[in-house]
Amino acid sequence: MATKIRLKRIGRRNRPFYRLIVIDSRKQRDGAAIEEVGWYNPIDDGHSYDLKGDRILHWLSQGAVPTNAAHKLMRRAGIAHRWHLIQQGMDEAEIDKEMKKWELNRED
């Protein structure tokens, strides 16, 4: 099954709110999700979001492909950088060290 990590729109008219979900790529945008892995609120001043990094990394390791919007959120949270380091074959200590550097240089 080809899975995607993408945004599911909920909320009322002119007040969007999104859930980050893992879903079969053949399903419609608001179809039944396999798992909810976070949320994103673009209306708040800080564009608030909360992502379950461990579950997203699990699904990425299973072959799930994020959409562009989902990838932007993952990049903002540092999950995309962590996934990149895992793909390079770094061990956990090196990854933690690189993530601390990333936290310091972050432009959020």
Where do the model's predicted regions map?
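Structured, basic alpha/beta domains of bacterial-type, RNA-associated proteins
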Residues: M1-D108
